[in-house]
Amino acid sequence: MNDRTEAVKAYLLDLQDRICAALEVEDGGARFVEDAWTRPGGGGGRTRVIENGALIEKGGVNFSHVHGDSLPPSASAHRPELAGRSFEALGVSLVIHPHNPYVPTSHANVRFFIAEKDGEEPVWWFGGGFDLTPYYGAEEDCVHWHRVARDACAPFGAEVYPRYKEWCDRYFHIKHRNEPRGVGGLFFDDLNQWDFDTSFAFMRAVGDAYLQAYLPIVQRRKATPFGERERQFQLLRRGRYVEYNLVYDRGTLFGLQSGGRTESILMSLPPQVAWGYDKRPEPGSPEARLTEYFLQDRDWLAAAPA
């Protein structure tokens, strides 16, 4: 492992520690349980799961560092020149499923790939982002989430936030439902057009922004009263989350195809979920407003104060 990979690994381990500590404080009840694991094909990781807390029904913050002799199809399909290269993949990936339907589900991921072949220059890239999936949307929350995303991108150029915001909208789209998974945020992949230090700094900016984006929303919503109606709608909407993750998510597919640890890969799935045949919210209801207003490709900062 070279110095660059060591630096990325040290940052990711620290990021996992910081996020887990902050979420434990916010929950106030449950604590993360760590499961350190090794991958037979090379590498390993630290899976941390929190369940049945005062705030978090289920959450996972996973660090992994895996390596192998060749990239799986999910990673090389759009970069065929990488076929046959050995690889190292490091990342932190997290999903938080709160119990209260008024607190959105959040997802974040930052990762680094390096692919090598004897006699050729290494090929490396960064990826990551964060996105928000509300069940009962609040415009204030969407604006805050996107403002933090914009501010994280700002030192790297005015064009960066719009580019990765739009990519997030496209990436987290449930094609068979023709609807977004949530209200978006940032998504980037194959980032190597800058030099290594700048690219690494951008990944850190995104990783560090997650708590700044999510915790104020949690603090605003976690005491909101709810009943069985809201809970059942949350479970139905979680079904969309499961559909997306198992059918489209590149990280999930990469993990499964590369012989990754199934329990860690599938930690993103909610603990309870429901499907109903052709369930549609009542017109004019708060539930209908989710899809009619919030689950649209929208510039949340257009009308918001700077």
From Swiss-Prot:
Reactions this protein catalyses: coproporphyrinogen III + O2 + 2 H(+) = protoporphyrinogen IX + 2 CO2 + 2 H2O
EC number(s) given by UniProt: 1.3.3.3
Residues at which substrate binds: S93, N109, V110, R111, G259, G260, R261
Residues given in the record as a divalent metal cation binding sites: H97, H107, H146, H176
GO molecular function ontology, one term from the record: coproporphyrinogen oxidase activity
PANTHER family to which the protein is assigned, alphabetical: COPROPORPHYRINOGEN III OXIDASE, MITOCHONDRIAL, OXYGEN-DEPENDENT COPROPORPHYRINOGEN-III OXIDASE, MITOCHONDRIAL
Protein name stated in the entry: Oxygen-dependent coproporphyrinogen-III oxidase
Species: Stutzerimonas stutzeri (strain A1501)
